[in-house]
Amino acid sequence: MARNKPIAKKLRLAKAAKQNRRIPVWVIVKTNRKVLTHPKRRYWRRTKLKE
């Protein structure tokens, strides 16, 4: 990817990177392990972003 990115694209990529985290441990504890996975989790090779 180019080093000189437009700021809007850089912000979108940063937002996607922040969203791409696992769910917190306290959520697992609070829900008695009913919620374990994050349905919108994205793996960089499988699912690409719209840029």
From Swiss-Prot:
Keyword field contains Ribonucleoprotein: yes
Database matches in Pfam families: Ribosomal_L39
Gene3D superfamilies (UniProt xref): Ribosomal protein L39e
The keyword Ribosomal protein belongs to this UniProt entry's keyword annotation: yes
GO BP annotations listed: translation
PANTHER family membership: LARGE RIBOSOMAL SUBUNIT PROTEIN EL39, RIBOSOMAL PROTEIN L39E
Family: Belongs to the eukaryotic ribosomal protein eL39 family.
Protein name as annotated: Large ribosomal subunit protein eL39
Native species: Thermococcus sibiricus (strain DSM 12597 / MM 739)
